[in-house]
Amino acid sequence: MLIVTTNDLPGWEIQRVCGEVFGLTVRSRNAFSQIGAGFKSMFGGELQGMTKNLAESRNEAMNRLIAEAHSRGGNAIIGMRFDTTELGDVWTEICAYGTAVQAVPVTDAAKYTASQLGYGGAAQAPAPAPSAQPQTYGAG
């Protein structure tokens, strides 16, 4: 699935707006990693346990976002953003959101991108159903 943070898709024609979509996950923070983070913050350095947890949470939110876009008939998401909220002292909410659209590549560059994404023909929309394998985004 083509996912962009911009509000348009250069080289693509948006034929239908499928609606706002989001993927959400709420995670509890491990008390032991928080204690370790407290010590680490006194001396500086990356909080690797918390970084790993955040990356996993973002991946889960993205996979849910993609599933929602597919269920609405979209083959692309525009205006994608992340929102992170702390709920109390022990929970973190991660939300990935954007607008699902049906888009068709119209330039050669966009047609190449479509072929790399497995869209098949240049005018194919929507994209194939999501695979059983979750996708991984960003560091992690």
Segments from the language model and where they lie:
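N-terminal presequence-like segments and the immediate start of the first folded domain
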Residues: M1-A31, T92-G140
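Short capping/connector residues at structural and topological boundaries
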Residues: D8-L9, I14, G44-Q48, A55, ...
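Short, well-ordered alpha-helical segments
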Residues: V21, V26, Q34-R81
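Short, conserved loop-to-beta-strand elements that form functional interface hotspots
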Residues: A76-L87, D108-G118
